[in-house]
Amino acid sequence: MSIPVAAGQQRADGGYRPDPATPRHPGAALTAAVLGNFVVILDAVVVNVALPSIRHSLGGGVSGLQWVVDGYTLMFAALLLSAGALSDRVGARRAFGRGMVLFVLASAACGLAPGIGALVTARLVQGSAAAVMMPSSMALIRQVFPGATTRARALAIWAMGGA
């Protein structure tokens, strides 16, 4: 007869009963959070390299190019705190997943944009999705790694992904 033990503790027979709140693949969750953080930061700066090509292909002048760059950053900064509260309400995993899907769709729209107006609109949506992804990826790490030591290590890896 076995003695019942709390979740996350070792049983008398040497087995281990996992905590149901702990995901089965914390490495996969950390990888997704790091990649999400990386693309959010990368997309804020990498568009600067493409500005001459964008101006040649789509036109729009200097003001249009400024909106291509600043629209993303503006939406990201404006919605970051609200998106963090949204992540707390709907759950980090759900918010991160939906933010990532929206980010990918907006990225595809950027690539397919026929003109500068469509590109600016897609960049605004991208910035909104990035605002959802950033705080929810950090909250996801907090949920996946409950121990202080493992959480600190995971947050360090996450921060390096955005550096």
Spans of model-derived segments:
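Transmembrane-helix bundle of Major Facilitator Superfamily
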Residues: 2-163
